Amino acid sequence: MAKFKDSTIEIVDPTPSSRPAPPLSAGAAGSEDATVDRSIGDIIAELRNLTAEQVEKVLKHQRDTGLRFGEAAVALGLASKDDVLYALAQQFHYPYAPEEQRKLSADLVALNEPFSPRAESFRALRSQLMMRVFTEGTVHPALAVISPEPGDGKTYCASNLAVTLAQLGGRTLLVDADMRVPRVHEVFNLKNGAGLSGILSGRADKQVIQQVAGIPSLFVLPVGTVPPNPQELVERPAFGLLMRELASKFDHVIVDTPAAVYGADCAVIAARCGAAVVVARKDASRAESLRELVASLAGAPVKLAGVVFNEF
């Protein structure tokens, strides 16, 4: 438990990364236990609301043909190949959203289109960061995702990176530190009543970290109220203390930031986090702005993990 002035934020101590902790906020999704040891048939039957008669029909076809349950259901027109793929993903604890259950932003390609080229690009980014920042056997720094200008795709990259890290099974926290134009709560369809700004000003409720529905290992700390003094809040010692505390409680901490054009916030946040990755939009971001941002980190106590050129 970490204290900031007169306010206290409750952070549940992490369990082993393969077993995510219970939800941290009311109304959050349940644990992944519901899918442990469930058969493909059970998952497909629930997904497609199959009646007992339909299930028996599939089982009979399965016995007659020697097909697997999923294959038999597809052959009878009671399920699709995507349904079978989703059921397999559930068995292997690989969370993603099938088409009819997609309730979050279309920007979340790692969740909505996990087998697409765009999702694969985020897995490639994850692999690089696992080697450069999130190395085994150490307390990982928080990773700030920064960009020169609005529209570079910073929130898009931070959100999808957080999803892909959570899909590894480790407890992952996405912090929205963009106290200028916050968007993370919109991307994940979460409440934004209390959050980071309240913690740093000493007036937040205890339960400010929310679990993302359908992704047991992913949690979000939204901005909360947009403050009039965002740069001053992140420059206070409490912000650095909070980042260190969160980094010790979660396997991965990703921090979304304001665009550099708004002020020094993003450079300060990167220094407090300890690591950063820069996002630039291909054929859109200005080279001079990118150079200035990278130069602003020179001499700061931050590891620059690389530059991501966003093509989407």
Model regions and ranges:
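Compact, charge-rich alpha-helical regulatory domains located at protein termini
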Residues: 69-71
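P-loop NTP-binding module
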Residues: 2-35, 39-65, 75-93, 97-98, ...
